Amino acid sequence: MSLLTEVETYVLSIVPSGPLKAEIAQRLEDVFAGKNTDLEALMEWLKTRPILSPLTKGILGFVFTLTVPSERGLQRRRFVQNALNGNGDPNNMDRAVKLYRKLKREITFHGAKEVALSYSTGALASCMGLIYNRMGTVTTEAAFGLVCATCEQIADSQHRSHRQMVTTTNPLIRHENRMVLASTTAKAMEQMAGSSEQAAEAMEVASQARQMVQAMRTVGTHPSSSAGLKDDLLENLQAYQKRMGVQMQRFK
């Protein structure tokens, strides 16, 4: 796996799924392939994206700045600086300086990542802030190692939180989660449907599912009433895909 492929993998792991994720993936691919060289336009685009947390925007801004060649005097962006200030905690800044000194001695991506993984997310963000604000310089490989270590920590905590939700025994949370998943799957079906004859059928199924979820939320139903809702939808989706000659098992 190449260095840039690895960086793209880690960065995308912290971006929530949806159309925006696909857009960001495309932007990253273009940047890494040297196709997008207008850093200012890229940062302006990133700044106005909805849904993303300030830290995720800060990390993406840092990656874009590292990768896109720019004029020396190009101004640093406030939204990235604010996201990478470690919540203004002086302890984070102290640790960030210590980490920065270690990163100065690291020249490889994996070496830098290993060193960085032993620090807190706040310290890692502050360290990125130091480099972003040109208070210090490290090799691009070391900076990418720092980025990937930060993303790994964020993805770990997101995964723990997701696992807690999936394994919860609280019937109300499970019920709502099933309805949200059914609704998301329905939306995906509508987006994939396109404009063929069978598409009308897929759209109909998706639309009915969304109406059912809406009704269940409006009226309030028993927590077990949503059981099987997403699975039924998936069966319909897969039957539709088979007829269209498409095989996608990814929604499972």
Swiss-Prot record:
Cellular location(s) = Virion membrane; Host nucleus
Q: Does the keyword Repeat apply?
A: no
Q: SMART domains recorded for this chain? A: Flu_M1_C (SM00759)
**Protein name per the record:** Matrix protein 1
How does it associate, per the subunit comment? Homodimer and homomultimer. Interacts with NEP. Binds ribonucleocapsid by both interacting with genomic RNA and NP protein. May interact with HA and NA. Cannot bind NP without genomic RNA.
Q: Which family does it belong to?
A: Belongs to the influenza viruses Matrix protein M1 family.
Organism for this UniProt entry: Influenza A virus (strain A/Duck/England/1/1956 H11N6)
Which GO biological process annotations does it have? viral budding from plasma membrane
**Region described as Membrane-binding: spans on this chain:** 1-164
What does the record give under GO molecular function? Answer: RNA binding; structural constituent of virion
Q: Which UniProt keywords apply?
A: Host nucleus, Membrane, RNA-binding, Viral matrix protein, Virion
Topology in the lipid bilayer? Peripheral membrane protein
Entry coiled-coil feature ranges: none
Function comment = Plays critical roles in virus replication, from virus entry and uncoating to assembly and budding of the virus particle. M1 binding to ribonucleocapsids (RNPs) in nucleus seems to inhibit viral transcription. Interaction of viral NEP with M1-RNP is thought to promote nuclear export of the complex, which is targeted to the virion assembly site at the apical plasma membrane in polarized epithelial cells. Interactions with NA and HA may bring M1, a non-raft-associated protein, into lipid rafts. Forms a continuous shell on the inner side of the lipid bilayer in virion, where it binds the RNP. Determines the virion's shape: spherical or filamentous. Clinical isolates of influenza are characterized by the presence of significant proportion of filamentous virions, whereas after multiple passage on eggs or cell culture, virions have only spherical morphology. Filamentous virions are thought to be important to infect neighboring cells, and spherical virions more suited to spread through aerosol between hosts organisms.
Annotated Gene Ontology cellular component terms = host cell nucleus; membrane; virion membrane
- HAMAP family associated with the record: INFV_M1
Q: Which domain of life is it from?
A: Viruses
Q: Where is this motif: Nuclear localization signal?
A: 101-105
Q: What else is known?
A: Most abundant protein in virion. When expressed alone can form virus-like particles in transfected cells.
InterPro entries according to UniProt: Flu_matrix_M1, Flu_matrix_M1_C, Flu_matrix_M1_N, Flu_matrix_M1_N_sub1, Flu_matrix_M1_N_sub2, INFV_M1
Residues of the region (RNP-binding) are 165-252
Pfam families, per the entry:
Flu_M1, Flu_M1_C
Q: What is its main location?
A: virion
